Amino acid sequence: GRSFLSAGLGYGGSCFPKDIAAFIAISEQLGVPFNLLKEVQSINARQIDRFVDAIREALWVFKEKKIAVWGLSFKPNTDDVRSSVAVGLVERMVAEGADVTVFDPKAMEKAKELLPVAKKIKFADSALAAAEGAEALVIATEWPEFAAVDLAELREKMRTPLIFDGRNIFDPVAAANFGFQYRGIGRG
């Protein structure tokens, strides 16, 4: 339905990617190529690349840059980090030398257990604590409490007022009014 048609970092989780792959496999077994779903898979895989490229372009390099990431679960209101786009994003930035601090309201413990890079990242006690001194904020999961954050307080916490909103939770005009350079997805 409409809840799955928002611009963003892409889809993940333990079911939907597997379901898409199954539909493609069944269609191929039946001799009816389902090119639309193949393209959906391809676009989803490229979304994270494009987002990482945009962050790298703004920061020049990831090496030793302090980046806050809000959200690790594949969707809000769960602790499930399996096949999470957010996890892939964190792994990519860490691989390029970023100093990443993360916060997720429910998925912190699961992330500590399951993330291969868990020993290389910091886990904050709150969204604002994660943003303390950050040169960029990356929003990877659309938790309601992230959208409710006081932008003035967030601006005070960050070293550089740069937001990469992978879920479009903030109004770009409101963010700009608080001095942020704001980059969402699919907003021009």
Residue locations for each model-derived region?
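Structural/interface elements that position substrates and couple domains in central-metabolism enzymes
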Residues: G1-G188
